[in-house]
């Protein structure tokens, strides 16, 4: 089962001051950015897709592009402390050929989308998260909440998304007992190299680490290649038969 998570960069967060020296025709061309993102998603053809920073119009376009192949959650708009009127949010896709529709339930949470489903007749909890970007204490509180509501017994777990916390082996977010952290590669290329997006799993067979994507050294090249300031993270996992 191929799992992908990606912060695709909402247009509402794109400002010239955030990307100094970059041609504005590149960063503000939302149509071209979305076309590039859609092409990458089709090429990867993941079984589970978890996106962050999806704008309402992009959500409608994604449903048109992928609705025949995936069950798609509603858009969970995120509310940030410094912007109560944000429009973008998280969306989770489950491939129709692998997940029975009548077993899928989506629950909006402050930090994203919580999904319950069956995969190969076994229960699976999937968290598509975009953790707080201002307060480590709030991130840990959100982390504690998702673990409090997840099913513990005989349930496989996937936690993926934008953690807004740089990867460190001993960090609580990446060092949860029983969970395997799959990404060791940089996922954000503005200002400096950072690994802040990841996929964690529990209950699955041990899987190889996520392969590193091409990392841009120029912001403009990154926008042209990915359409976002984040890189996608992909891992392949399977359950114990």
Regions found by a protein language model. Name each.
Residues 1-65, 239-241:
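N-terminal, active-site-proximal structural segment of metallo-dependent hydrolase catalytic domains
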Residues 8, 54, 129-131, 162-163, ...:
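Active-site metal-binding loops of divalent metal-dependent hydrolases
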Residues 21-27, 129-139:
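Surface-exposed cleft-lining segments at the edges of enzyme active sites
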Residues 28-37, 54, 85, 106-109, ...:
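Soluble or luminal CAZymes and related metallo-dependent hydrolases
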Residues 48-127, 131, 210-216:
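Structured beta-strand-rich core segments of catalytic domains in phosphoester-bond hydrolases
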Residues 116-118, 137, 141, 148-158, ...:
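Metal-dependent phosphoester-hydrolase catalytic domains
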